[in-house]
Regions:
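Aromatic- and acidic-residue-enriched carbohydrate-binding clefts of CAZyme catalytic domains
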Residues: 43-45, 82, 87-95, 128-153, ...
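Aromatic-lined substrate-binding rim segments of carbohydrate-active enzymes
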Residues: 64-131, 212-217
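N-terminal carbohydrate-binding accessory modules
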Residues: 23-78, 109
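Substrate-binding/catalytic cleft of secreted carbohydrate-active enzymes
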Residues: 120, 124-157, 163-309
């Protein structure tokens, strides 16, 4: 009992030690943080870290303060965030640290303003269900480069990224008067080591040690940590960094494993305490019960284990940022657009029953928890009229294709995301089984402008019957649904076709034309565009009035597959298979008065004249 009372005192101290940071670049440190004597020590006193993960890249910048206040009201004292390399290096050598959600300095300032410590997770590999695990896609095009290993070309690229990042965040470390108290080296590297046994363990360790050294060389002078499953410390732990556990429920295991790799002492932390789980298209929406979660949290509290809720607030994979997984039986498991994660704070920033259950417990340890902020206003948009259309085949008539004898990958075409239309003209008739086991994601096949069928790596459909008459055209519209972000195959995540298609086992080569459709910006239709043909991919465009902007959810349940832009912002992918059937439209993306909407519908089995904005998300409706 005396031990438990001591733990409670420590936790209460931890939760009240943060009166708020005032950040001034290069300022003298106002607070101190270190790992000492088996403890996290803040201003000379042992504390427990009660953190929540939120990725600034997945939350509109206008809502950062609201979400951080939601975390503070939950009873947390820190926020953890990944930095996704490819979110900031938008093209080779082109860096963006200032626009929209990319302004990491503004996010760190917001965290400081709200009195939250920051735990920075810069990778360079992040995972996080993010496109390519955070790596820029073009790394895979460098012939001499091997990612995530002791390779000069790769480590040189990592150093450039880390130096760029450090220039933005160095002065936000607690040693400089800022809120960042810890930085992570690499991420879940032990998992990769276990998956890549073809690489010697000493080579793996040389690489991870090099990443740690690059962080130090760039000016990170705060405690460093790693995060891995407790059974993977042999490959994941880095000398000089605190090992933390991911998803470990057993208190004794946590202490035993950390002690073994940290000089026999703590502190002990679960760096990823899973509030929910990730979600894939064509699979059920994952949930973790509040009861199971809070019972485990209580065990950590009783044992003095620090933790980081992964996720406390997931946010949204706007645009083409979602990643993908795979299994031995499923070639691709693309992640849905929503990163709700069944987290305590919903995708739209709402307090869930899980939030209330957690808060009730944490308030026992901290009497100064502020009130829960009000929700962002929610509106409905009953009828958004779609007044213009253009089928994609008409649109590409004015484009210049890439011509090649083979079917290049997206990467070979110099294209990171979006779509590519592969076209070939046949002077002789051919009929039989079209085989496309080299398709990386999803494609729709057309003959002379008529839809024939679909190719789908998600469901394992890689062949179909075709009949191509004399003097006819075969088209295949291929989508990149997100590069693999986890596992040994991350180094092989190419898009498009990695092998040529065959018809009746004969490779179809020669005279291919590729139309590149990156969709990096919303397509704009000219006045008078009204082209439409059922079955062909179509672009819809419309305008709608908003009297008072607020959050809403576009109801895409009756649509097929595609993406939506509102006022030029790509809200992400929709797909009728589910489980996600709505797209979150933050009110901060809307404006009072006229607003523009563009929908690219790939399947186009049903013609639409409107779309609606409803007040509740649909995230768990699976249609197979």
């Amino acid at each position: 009992m005396r031990r438990n009372l001591l733990i409670i005192v420590i936790v209460m101290t931890a939760m009240t030690l943060l009166p708020g940071f005032t950040v001034t670049a290069g300022a003298k440190a106002k607070h101190t943080f270190k790992i000492e004597g088996g403890n996290f020590v803040y201003d000379g006193k042992p504390i427990q870290i009660h953190s929540g993960e939120m990725h600034y890249s997945r939350v509109p910048a206008a809502y950062w303060h609201h979400r951080l206040r939601m975390m503070k009201a939950l009873g947390l004292n820190a926020v953890a965030t990944y930095v996704f390399w490819n979110y900031h290096e938008t093209a080779p050598g082109v860096w963006d640290w200032t626009t929209g959600n990319r302004n990491i300095r503004a996010f760190l300032k917001a965290a400081a303003d709200e009195g939250m410590m920051v735990i920075l997770r810069p990778g360079p590999y992040a995972c996080g269900e993010w496109e390519y695990g955070g790596y820029p896609w073009w790394l895979s095009t460098v012939p001499e480069m091997k990612i995530r290993t002791q390779n000069k070309a790769f480590l040189d690229s990592c150093r450039t990224y880390i130096d760029q990042l450090a220039a933005q965040v160095r002065d936000f470390q607690i040693t400089k008067g800022g809120p960042i108290v810890m930085v992570q080296a690499e991420n879940e590297f032990g998992s990769y080591v276990s998956q890549r046994k073809d690489i010697p363990l000493d080579v793996h360790r040389q690489y991870s040690a090099a990443i740690r050294q690059q962080l130090i060389d760039a000016g990170f002078d705060i405690p460093m940590f790693t995060s891995d499953g407790s059974w993977l410390f042999e490959g994941g732990a880095i000398e000089g960094a605190l090992p933390t556990c991911n998803g470990e429920n057993n208190i004794n295991t946590i202490k035993k494993k950390v002690d073994a790799y940290h000089g026999g002492v703590g502190p002990y932390m679960v760096a990823e305490f899973y509030t929910g789980w990730l979600d894939h298209w064509n699979e059920p929406f994952e949930k973790v019960s509040s009861d199971a979660f809070t019972k485990q949290m209580q065990k950590y509290l009783d044992a003095g284990i620090s933790f980081n809720f992964y996720m406390v607030h997931g946010g949204t994979n706007f645009g083409f940022t979602s990643g993908a997984n795979y299994t031995k039986d499923i070639r691709l498991q693309p992640d849905i657009t929503s990163y709700d994660y069944d987290a305590p704070i919903s995708e739209a920033g709402w307090a869930t029953p899980k939030y209330e259950a957690i808060r009730k417990i944490l308030m026992q340890y901290n009497k100064d928890v502020p009130a829960v902020p009000e929700r962002i206003p929610v509106i409905t948009l009953p009828q958004i009229r779609l007044t213009q259309t253009q089928n994609l085949f008409d649109r590409i008539e004015g484009m210049t294709p890439v011509e090649c004898d083979t079917m290049p990958t997206f990467e070979a075409l110099g294209q990171g995301h979006g779509y590519v239309l592969y076209r070939r003209h046949f002077n002789q008739p051919i009929a039989g089984v079209l085989k496309a086991d080299g398709i990386a994601d999803y494609g729709i096949v057309y003959v002379n402008g008529e839809k024939v069928g679909e190719l789908n790596a998600v469901t394992g459909v890689d062949s179909l019957e075709v009949e191509v008459p004399f003097n006819s055209t075969l088209d295949i519209l291929v989508e990149n649904m997100g590069r693999i972000n986890y596992g040994a195959r991350i180094s092989e995540s190419f898009k498009g076709f990695v092998r040529p298609i065959t018809i009746n086992d004969n490779p179809i080569e020669g005279e291919w034309k590729m139309y590149c459709l990156p969709m990096s910006e919303a397509p704009v239709l000219a006045a008078g565009d009204h082209g439409y043909a059922k079955g062909l991919p179509v672009i819809y465009q419309g305008q709608f009035d908003v009297a008072s902007p607020g959050d809403t959810f576009l109801d895409m349940e009756e649509w097929g597959k595609g993406i939506v832009f509102v006022n030029g912002v790509n809200l992400g992918r929709y797909w009728k298979v589910g489980p996600q059937q709505t797209l979150y439209l933050p009110g901060c993306f809307l404006k009072k008065g006229k607003n523009d909407i563009v929908i690219f519908e790939q399947q186009n089995d049903v013609r639409h004249d409107h779309v609606s904005g409803i007040d509740t998300p649909k995230l768990d409706i699976l249609k197979k």
